[in-house]
C-alpha cells in the first residue's frame, strides 16, 4: 500500500487500548481494528485508576501493509492513528503523536500537508478534536529541523 497521508482520530471514549478497539470494531461486524496505531491515555479499562506508565504508549493496530478502515474514501492511501480520548489529551499522548507522525513522515516521505484530522474529510465529525492547522505548523518546524540536522550530520546526504 502506498501511503500518501496520515489521518488522526480520537476514540471518543475515556479509556481503551488497541485490543479494546479491535473488540469494539468486531462487535459492530467489522473486520477488526481499523486504525494502524493507537495512542493510550493511561486509562486501559473503564472504572480503573489512571496508570502514568501506560499514558502515551503507541500500540500497533491493523498492520501497516493492510488497508485501514478509518476514513471513508481515504483508507487505501492512508494510515490511521487513534488517540484514546475525546476532547482532552495528555501531554504524553501529544508527544507520542508528534513522534509517531514524525517517524511516519520520514518513512513515507510525507509533508505536514499530508497529515489530516478525520474531521477534514467528514463534515459530520469533529475528531480528533484538536486544531490540525496548529499541529501541522509544529510538525513542519520539527520536520525542517530534523531534515536539516540529518543533512548536516550525514555530510549533506539525505
Task: Locate predicted features.
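Basic/polar, cationic surfaces and motifs that engage anionic cell-wall
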Residues: 1-7, 11, 41-60, 75-158
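Cell wall/extracellular polymer interaction/catalysis modules
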Residues: 1-39, 57
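Alpha-helical scaffolding within the catalytic cores
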Residues: 61-69
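Short glycine/proline-enriched loop/turn "hinge" motifs that connect secondary-structure elements
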Residues: 68-76
